[in-house]
């Protein structure tokens, strides 16, 4: 790419132009007269991390001198009366841009009404004239404003940018709102609130906001000196600078009454996304005004040379977990020294100084290694505080001062207490490129709201001198549901110190006799040196089950004593430190709440369950992971979400998955996207981005389910459709009434009317009960959770009932979901008739009844289907209304038409010979054939056809070898000689007749009469 000067033109044309000198640099020597138009790609410096590349149609402009490119201002709706970006990167595009398949244009409401009165041809003509669209010439892109404020391009398919062919490109017009006009208004100098006779003001009270990322030097006008203190740069619109009467690059003072700081202000060049009524500063400046939303900005009248140089400066570490770890100290102090001495820094007493470092590299860091150029990836941040400042003759300094590495003596000592800035006020995470943390919308995540309220209340009590000794237990029935993320996010949002200890990583001779003492002592050692300097703080003990055991499953007396001792010691630890250090909150997390002993739970004031995300919560999680900042965090390639991605559909497809599964899905989708769009030219037409589409995400979701669903027991949507089932039309209608109504019209049941959630299929074996249950799940997009009786049994007392509870909990986590109990009579037989010594089956039935009772009221989106051959063996309580209250008999087809429908469903994917008549075949079948018998009939017919064709192939091979004097094997014959006809299998009528002749019905006529008697008995009762 070539660095070129950039100018914007006010003409309504969509053509760019380049100077002859730039053209020669890009394409080689130019002829005297350039007769054709060409294309160049332009990349503007950006105030965000995500700059896009534009391809524009260009011409040669002989009036431009030097390396200059001129862009139409409409390309970014640039207000020409404000300072503009004057540099860009330009590259020649030597191939013709692709033609777009479709373009979606949003049209202002009133204009849309007028356009609908025109023919399609006149509509295109209007857009062509007003938008300066050249047929197969002008490059358009998503987000482009054709003419302000009336038309904007919403989407381009299949690329981000390309050509419009009026004959091939489909143009869709969408009606916009009348608010488009206000949205498109440009913020230029005409928006200034200065009267004609009014001069600039000395002071301006304005909103102070934190920059989301450092500003690149190409956007600093005028260019800053290399030794300028860039941590004191602030940025504002030209309107703000004009009102203050200062020029870009001037010194200003920021003050909130109690605090005052010197800064250097630069104008925000257009185009940019910043608000014109705010001033933007770095985290180092914003943190000193953490209590103020607005600051007073005024011109600084002094000179930098007048600021005194300190003779000695004492800097203290701000107490935090990272600042207390010895392994980090070398790299932290090295980075602190580099930060202070790299520029002509200006400091104040009590200034907070941020220092970032690479925690992964800290253990290998040394002074010798620091002499080499190492690519660090800073992932952590600590704060330092300017404690005492002395000038010459030991005179204390209370104002601004400078540090000269040749004169100033720096001393780091002591540890001071200061809370980290709240992320809502000072977004240091985004600015320094630290790993982002999911922000919980407390309107959607009710458990996050409760946890946030608990921590907020505890902090307020501490600020008012009350020590409430808060302890919280976060628990879940599934792993990786976001308990640690919840704690980190809340602490960052509120500005509270976090001391995080993963108990799974503690292993101080775990098998030794005094393991309890070692573990508790290690926890105390980790926190007791930090807590005195971090009030208020949260001590987070993750994976509590890692150091605890379930007491009722321990048979060894010594181990039982150790387990009880561990619970008592941890409870004592909570009490000791919450009393010794007011404002300390202990938060524990576990995936097995039943392992936590009563000694700990009695000391825990709050227990919060963190469930598997609901569909609404998964929408929030997907939206966050697919946002530009998170999607491109630490990514070598730039990714973006395509317009065909529907977050709500992704949330529906990912039922039952945890946040870590969703993160894995997005990462897999990025891999799929990269493999699909490796070519450089493909990237060019996508604006420098790789767009993740819905197919990438759907493939990633299916892959995640295939890999993890069986191992973790996650329900998934099967793949059985109504077309795969024949002869059960009456039953389908009953199912639609039971399941489809609550899903489509939940408001009908909001008034308190109980819905029917349980269906029981009964009848002879092989009549399609399991297949029908899967078809229900598939056609209503419900997850399918199949339960077998032996899976529920466990040798320990109470565990079998717990397994029943876990089944229903996993199904609730995967709503909407169908729980299918196959062979229900083995799971829930009549109570009192079993001979098991512990009464396990009776307790399972009782637990199943209790779970079913909860479905009619709190089981929205949860359905239970049972299947049995012997409904007379079921416990009668299961069949009362509110449980399995819908009994559907799936019998044997009693008409030839139903039998023919079954045959059509089973042979749907067969290649049938014209002589095959399924109606005639059904007419020859007795009425004792079940669905399974018909399946066997079709399978045997296919096998007969394959055997017949295999015999024909053997004859063809032998005949060919004799005729051509060859010795081909069957495999060689298929590789060299065989045609498509030889490899296709066509099932003939004779194959069906042979299969029917050999088929033995699975249900005799006597057995069928027995099932009919059972049906009559149930229907009459």
From Swiss-Prot:
SMART domains attached here? AAA
One Pfam family name is: AAA
One of this protein's GO BP terms? protein import into peroxisome matrix
Question: Which amino acids does the record list as binding ATP?
Answer: 763-770
Query: What is the enzyme's main class?
Result: hydrolase
User: Where does this one sit in the cell?
Assistant: Cytoplasm, Cytosol; Peroxisome membrane
Q: Describe its assembly.
A: Interacts with PEX1; forming the PEX1-PEX6 AAA ATPase complex, which is composed of a heterohexamer formed by a trimer of PEX1-PEX6 dimers.
Q: Which family does it belong to?
A: Belongs to the AAA ATPase family.
Role description: Component of the PEX1-PEX6 AAA ATPase complex, a protein dislocase complex that mediates the ATP-dependent extraction of the PEX5 receptor from peroxisomal membranes, an essential step for PEX5 recycling. Specifically recognizes PEX5 monoubiquitinated at 'Cys-6', and pulls it out of the peroxisome lumen through the PEX2-PEX10-PEX12 retrotranslocation channel. Extraction by the PEX1-PEX6 AAA ATPase complex is accompanied by unfolding of the TPR repeats and release of bound cargo from PEX5.
- Give the protein name, as stated in the record: Peroxisomal ATPase PEX6
Its gene name is PEX6
């Amino acid at each position: 790419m070539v660095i070129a000067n950039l100018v914007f033109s006010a003409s309504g044309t969509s053509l760019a132009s380049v100077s002859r000198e730039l053209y020669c640099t890009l394409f080689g020597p130019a002829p005297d007269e350039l007769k054709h138009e060409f294309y160049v790609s332009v990349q503007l410096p950006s105030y965000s991390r995500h700059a896009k590349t534009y391809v524009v149609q260009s011409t040669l402009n002989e009036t431009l001198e030097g390396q200059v490119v001129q862009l139409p201002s409409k390309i970014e709706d640039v207000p020409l009366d404000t300072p503009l970006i004057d540099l860009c990167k330009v590259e020649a595009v030597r191939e013709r841009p692709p033609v777009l398949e479709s373009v979606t244009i949003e049209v202002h409401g009133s204009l849309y009404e007028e356009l609908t009165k025109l023919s399609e041809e006149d509509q295109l003509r209007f857009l062509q004239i007003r938008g300066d669209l050249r047929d197969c010439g002008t490059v358009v892109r998503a987000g482009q404003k054709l003419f302000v404020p009336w038309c904007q391009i919403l989407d381009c398919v299949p690329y981000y940018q390309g050509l419009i062919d009026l004959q091939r490109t489909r143009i869709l017009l969408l009606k916009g709102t009348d608010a488009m006009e206000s949205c498109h208004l440009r913020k230029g100098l005409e928006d200034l609130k200065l009267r004609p006779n009014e001069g600039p003001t000395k002071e301006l009270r304005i909103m102070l906001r934190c920059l989301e990322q450092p500003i690149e030097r190409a956007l600093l006008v005028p260019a800053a000196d290399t030794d300028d203190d860039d941590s004191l740069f602030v940025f504002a619109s030209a309107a703000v600078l004009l009102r203050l009467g200062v020029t870009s690059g001037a010194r200003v003072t920021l003050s909130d009454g109690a605090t005052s700081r010197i800064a250097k202000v630069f104008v925000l060049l257009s185009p940019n996304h910043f608000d014109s009524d705010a001033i933007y500063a770095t985290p180092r400046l914003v943190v000193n005004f953490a209590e103020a939303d607005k600051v007073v900005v005024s011109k600084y009248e002094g000179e930098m040379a007048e600021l005194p140089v300190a003779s000695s400066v004492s800097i203290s570490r701000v107490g935090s977990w990272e600042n207390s770890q010895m392994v980090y100290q070398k790299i932290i102090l090295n980075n602190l020294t580099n930060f202070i001495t790299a520029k002509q820094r200006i400091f104040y007493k009590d200034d907070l100084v941020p220092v970032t470092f690479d925690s992964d590299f800290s253990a290998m860091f040394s002074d010798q290694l620091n002499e080499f150029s190492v690519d660090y990836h800073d992932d952590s941040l600590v704060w330092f505080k300017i404690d005492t400042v002395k000038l010459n003759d030991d005179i204390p300094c209370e104002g601004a001062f400078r540090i000269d590495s040749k004169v100033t003596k720096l001393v780091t000592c002591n540890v001071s207490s200061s809370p980290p800035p709240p992320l809502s006020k000072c977004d240091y995470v985004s600015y320094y490129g630290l790993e982002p943390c999911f922000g919980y919308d407390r309107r959607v995540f009710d458990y996050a709201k409760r946890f946030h309220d608990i921590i907020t209340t505890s902090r307020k009590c501490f600020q008012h001198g009350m020590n409430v000794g808060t302890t919280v237990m976060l628990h879940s029935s599934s792993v990786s549901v976001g308990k640690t993320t919840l704690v980190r996010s809340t602490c960052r949002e509120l500005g509270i110190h976090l001391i995080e200890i993963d108990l799974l990583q503690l292993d101080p001779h775990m098998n030794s006799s005094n393991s309890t003492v070692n573990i508790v002592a290690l926890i105390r050692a980790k926190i007791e040196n930090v807590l005195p300097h971090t009030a208020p703080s949260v001590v987070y003990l993750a994976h509590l089950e890692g150091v605890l055991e379930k007491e009722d499953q321990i048979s060894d007396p010594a181990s039982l004593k150790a387990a009880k001792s561990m619970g008592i010691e941890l409870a004592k630890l909570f009490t000791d430190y919450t009393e010794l250090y007011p404002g300390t909150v202990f938060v524990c997390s576990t995936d097995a709440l039943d392992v936590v002993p009563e000694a700990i739970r009695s000391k825990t004031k709050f227990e919060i369950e963190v469930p598997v995300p609901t569909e609404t919560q998964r929408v929030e999680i997907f939206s966050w992971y697919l946002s530009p900042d998170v999607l491109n965090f630490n990514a070598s390639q730039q990714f973006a979400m395509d317009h065909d991605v529907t977050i709500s559909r992704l949330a529906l497809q990912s039922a039952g998955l945890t946040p870590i599964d969703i993160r894995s899905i997005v990462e897999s989708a990025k891999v799929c996207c990269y493999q699909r769009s490796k070519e450089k030219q493909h990237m060019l037409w996508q604006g420098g981005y790789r767009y993740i589409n819905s197919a990438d995400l759907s493939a990633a979701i299916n892959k995640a389910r295939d890999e993890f669903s069986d191992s973790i027991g996650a329900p998934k949507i099967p793949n059985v459709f109504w077309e795969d089932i024949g002869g059960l039309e009456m039953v389908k209608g009953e199912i639609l009434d039971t399941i489809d109504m609550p899903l489509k019209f939940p408001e009908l049941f909001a008034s308190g009317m109980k819905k029917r959630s349980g269906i029981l299929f009964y009848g002879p074996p092989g009549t399609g009960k399991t297949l029908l249950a899967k078809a229900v799940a598939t056609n209503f997009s419900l997850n399918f959770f199949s339960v077998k009786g032996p899976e529920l049994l466990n040798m320990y007392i109470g565990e079998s009932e717990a397994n029943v509870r876990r089944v229903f909990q996993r199904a609730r986590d995967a709503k909407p979901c169908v729980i299918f109990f196959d062979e229900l009579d083995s799971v829930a037989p009549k109570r009192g008739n079993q001979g098991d010594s512990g009464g396990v089956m009776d307790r399972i039935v009782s637990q199943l009844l209790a779970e079913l009772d909860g479905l009619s009221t709190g089981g929205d989106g949860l359905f239970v289907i049972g299947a049995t051959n012997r409904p007379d063996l079921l416990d009668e309580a299961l069949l009362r209304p509110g449980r399995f209250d819908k009994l559907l008999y799936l019998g044997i087809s009693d008409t030839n038409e139903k039998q023919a429908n079954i045959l059509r469903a089973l042979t749907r994917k067969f290649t049938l010979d014209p002589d095959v008549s399924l109606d005639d075949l059904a007419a020859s079948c007795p009425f004792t054939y079940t669905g399974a018998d018909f399946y066997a009939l079709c399978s045997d017919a296919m096998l007969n056809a394959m055997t017949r064709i295999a015999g024909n192939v053997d004859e063809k091979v032998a005949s060919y070898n004799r005729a051509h004097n060859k010795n081909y094997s069957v495999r060689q014959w298929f590789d060299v000689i065989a045609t498509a006809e030889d490899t296709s299998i066509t099932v003939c009528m004779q194959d069906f007749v042979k299969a029917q002749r050999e088929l033995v019905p699975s249900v005799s006529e006597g057995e069928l009469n027995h099932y009919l008697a059972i049906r009559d008995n149930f229907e009459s009762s």
